[in-house]
Amino acid sequence: MNRLRYLTAGESHGPSLTAIIEGMPANLELNEGDINRDLARRQLGYGRGGRMLIEKDKVNFTSGVRWGKTLGSPITLSIQNRDWENWGKKMSPVAEDFVEGMAITHPRPGHADLTGVIKYRQDDARNILERSSARETAARVAVGALCKKFLADLGMSVLGYVSELGGVCADASLEDYHERFALSEESPCRTFDAEAEQRMIKAIDRAKEDGDSLGGVVEVAVLGAPVGLGSYVQWDRRLDGRLAYAMMSIQAFKGVEIGLGFEAGRRPGSQVHDEIFHQGDEFVRKTNRAGGLEGGMTNGAPIIVRGAMKPIPTLYQPLQTVDFRTKDAFAAVVERSDVCAVPAAAVVAEAVVAIEMAQAMLEKFGGDAMEEVKQNLQAYGEYVQRF
């Protein structure tokens, strides 16, 4: 069983972000544009902050790719932080560069600041917030873009967009996921409903005027996944659990749904389960309330995953906190931030879902080279057609 794994490293205002991916087969055609396209998408969206005017993320391959193809060895991706020019002393690894009086001691509610300084025995929340920052997601988007390229070569698509923002819901009557995605790519709020988009923009503008922030819900659709990815035989091999884990690992995500999600708990069984029919030479379901996953496995229908993102906790009208040294009351520190990052979160959600789907495909059809993976997938597809 082939296994795909990765690590990311780097601080928000450090020199760079780095990701190392192991397990990607050889001979996948790949270029920097495949990665940079999604890095640019992550930086777009109505409500983003000033950092996006500084960073223009570009990836650099430093291992694992030669002449436009993967080698089968670990792939290293590096993304330079342009803002490092302004932070060289503040984030220096050299002890002699220490500057007195720069410690952040007013932890921000809703962030990792206070718990982090307690856990890691720090006296400066800067040492926590630099790594806990959502800037880290740029590295995961790069890994996800690589996985999306792998999946595309196997006939699969991973499409992310915004279904709700600041309490404004997009009209879900549009059922064509490719059309939803195409429309959302033209939207500053990354949504497919033009009327809802205008109300979302107004909500973001109001929040900015009030020094507040907004959250929302993103949806990811996976199209073209074969039957039988994942497994029911152990809890940690259930693909729905792994997708939920991946989505919940995104900074500021507080809830995940697959298919009907929580609505399934409000309906009788007759309105939840997808009836099975046989048409032509295949089994079909006329509904997809399960969201493409039954028993922890893909059933051949589109996989539909949604994630709820809370409002960004850095507010320009700061919430109450205390100085963790003196215990005196203060307003929370204001770090440069977004009013709303939900449109960007849809791209991050795409990435983490793509990583899990690539892992599941390699577990089922893995090989050392893309040619072998495709042969295994084709043989399995022929078996499914005969069943």
UniProtKB/Swiss-Prot annotation:
<keyword id="KW-0288">FMN</keyword>
<dbReference type="GO" id="GO:0004107">
    <property type="term" value="F:chorismate synthase activity"/>
</dbReference>
<feature type="binding site">
    <location>
        <position position="48"/>
    </location>
    <ligand>
        <name>NADP(+)</name>
    </ligand>
</feature>
<feature type="binding site">
    <location>
        <begin position="251"/>
        <end position="252"/>
    </location>
    <ligand>
        <name>FMN</name>
    </ligand>
</feature>
<feature type="binding site">
    <location>
        <begin position="310"/>
        <end position="314"/>
    </location>
    <ligand>
        <name>FMN</name>
    </ligand>
</feature>
<dbReference type="InterPro" id="IPR035904">
    <property type="entry name" value="Chorismate_synth_AroC_sf"/>
</dbReference>
<keyword id="KW-0521">NADP</keyword>
<dbReference type="GO" id="GO:0009073">
    <property type="term" value="P:aromatic amino acid family biosynthetic process"/>
</dbReference>
<keyword id="KW-0028">Amino-acid biosynthesis</keyword>
<keyword id="KW-0285">Flavoprotein</keyword>
<dbReference type="GO" id="GO:0005829">
    <property type="term" value="C:cytosol"/>
</dbReference>
<dbReference type="InterPro" id="IPR020541">
    <property type="entry name" value="Chorismate_synthase_CS"/>
</dbReference>
<keyword id="KW-0456">Lyase</keyword>
<feature type="binding site">
    <location>
        <position position="336"/>
    </location>
    <ligand>
        <name>FMN</name>
    </ligand>
</feature>
<dbReference type="GO" id="GO:0010181">
    <property type="term" value="F:FMN binding"/>
</dbReference>
<dbReference type="GO" id="GO:0009423">
    <property type="term" value="P:chorismate biosynthetic process"/>
</dbReference>
<feature type="binding site">
    <location>
        <position position="295"/>
    </location>
    <ligand>
        <name>FMN</name>
    </ligand>
</feature>
<keyword id="KW-0274">FAD</keyword>
<dbReference type="GO" id="GO:0008652">
    <property type="term" value="P:amino acid biosynthetic process"/>
</dbReference>
<keyword id="KW-0057">Aromatic amino acid biosynthesis</keyword>
<dbReference type="InterPro" id="IPR000453">
    <property type="entry name" value="Chorismate_synth"/>
</dbReference>
<comment type="subunit">
    <text>Homotetramer.</text>
</comment>
<comment type="similarity">
    <text>Belongs to the chorismate synthase family.</text>
</comment>
<dbReference type="Pfam" id="PF01264">
    <property type="entry name" value="Chorismate_synt"/>
</dbReference>
<feature type="binding site">
    <location>
        <begin position="131"/>
        <end position="133"/>
    </location>
    <ligand>
        <name>FMN</name>
    </ligand>
</feature>
<protein>
    <recommendedName>
        <fullName>Chorismate synthase</fullName>
        <ecNumber>4.2.3.5</ecNumber>
    </recommendedName>
</protein>
<feature type="binding site">
    <location>
        <position position="42"/>
    </location>
    <ligand>
        <name>NADP(+)</name>
    </ligand>
</feature>
<comment type="function">
    <text>This reaction introduces a second double bond into the aromatic ring system.</text>
</comment>
<comment type="pathway">
    <text>Metabolic intermediate biosynthesis; chorismate biosynthesis; chorismate from D-erythrose 4-phosphate and phosphoenolpyruvate: step 7/7.</text>
</comment>
